[in-house]
Amino acid sequence: MTKSQRLQVAIIGSGNIGTDLMIKVMRNSKHLSMGAMVGIDAASDGLARAGRLGVPVTHEGITGLVGLPNFGDIRIAFDATSAGAHAGHNEVLQRHGVKVIDLTPAAIGPYVIPVVNLEEQLSSPNINMVTCGGQATIPIVRAVSQIARVRYAEIVASIASKSAGPGTRANIDEFTETTSAAIVSVGRAEHGKAIIVLNPAEPSLMMRDTVFCLVDADADQEAIRLSVRDMVRSVAAYVPGYRLKQDVQFDVIPDKAPVNVPGIGRVSGLKVSVFLEVEGAAHYLPAYAGNLDIMTSAALAAADKIAASLITAR
C-alpha cells in the first residue's frame, strides 16, 4: 500500500504508551502513517524519538496539534493521556471530524474489544479501549458467555509495578469501574468485578490475568474449554504474547455449600477459572510490560480496521 493510501494519525500523549504505539504504527500498521506526536513536556523521550523519526511533533498539547500544518490531513487520533484530560481533547477533535481512539478509562465512547465487538462500532466517532485488564480478560468472559449464562465474572489483573506509570496509578479507580462495566456490557456477564494488583517483585514479572466465571452447574464444560481456546487464538493474532498459562479449570459449587458473591448473595453452580499471561513485544517497552503492549496492540488493531473502512468508503 502506498503512503497516499494510508491515513494519517496523531498520538496525544508522548509517554510510554504513546511512544510504543508510535513504533507499532510505523512498523506494523497496514493502513496508517504517523501524522503527529503530541505532548506537553518538550524534553520527553517520546517527542525526541518522534522527532528523530521524522514525525511532526508539538509539546503544546491539543492546541499545538490543531496548529500543525498537516492537521487537516489527520483522520484518526489516539488519546494516551488521562481520563481527566480526554473530555477536552475529544471535544476539540470531534469539531474537526477526527475519529478518536481513547486509551484512557474516560469511556466517552462505546467500549471496544477488537476481537469481540469492533465490527459493530466502526462508525463510532469515539471508541474506548477499556483497560489493559479489560483487553486481556473480557474476551474470555465473552467466550464463556457464548456457551453458558455467566451469572458473575471476576477478573484479577496483576502487572509489574515498574510498568505502572503515573497515569496508570492516577486512574486505579477508573480502571476498576471501567473494566467492571465492560465485563457486563461487552463480556455479557450479568455481574462483573475487576481487581488490579501492582506486583513489586524483582525481577519484574509479566502481566498475569485470572478470570473467574460462575455459570450454571450443567453447562457444557468441553464447549466452554474449546470456546476459550478459540478466543485466545483470536486475541493472539494481534497480541502475539497473549497465551493460556494452563488448561481451563472447572469447580462445582454444590447447592449444599454455596458461596457468597457480593451484590448477588449465596450462589451455587460451576466456577470456570482461566489463567492468562501476556508478554510484551518489546518494541519500546520491556517484555514484562504486557499490560501496556496489549493496549497499544488492541488500539492499533482497531485503528487499522477503522482506517480500512474509511479508505474503502472513499
UniProtKB/Swiss-Prot annotation:
Keywords: Aromatic hydrocarbons catabolism, NAD, Oxidoreductase, Plasmid
Keyword set includes Oxidoreductase: yes
Reactions accelerated catalytically: acetaldehyde + NAD(+) + CoA = acetyl-CoA + NADH + H(+)
Single Gene Ontology BP annotation: catabolic process
Active site, renumbered: C132
The family this protein is said to belong to: Belongs to the acetaldehyde dehydrogenase family.
Domain of life per record: Bacteria
Organism encoding this protein: Polaromonas sp. (strain JS666 / ATCC BAA-500)
The protein, known as: Acetaldehyde dehydrogenase
EC number: 1.2.1.10
Residues that, per the record, bind NAD(+): S14, G15, N16, I17, S163, A164, G165, P166, G167, T168, R169, A170, N171, N291
Any one Gene Ontology molecular-function term assigned to this protein's record: NAD binding
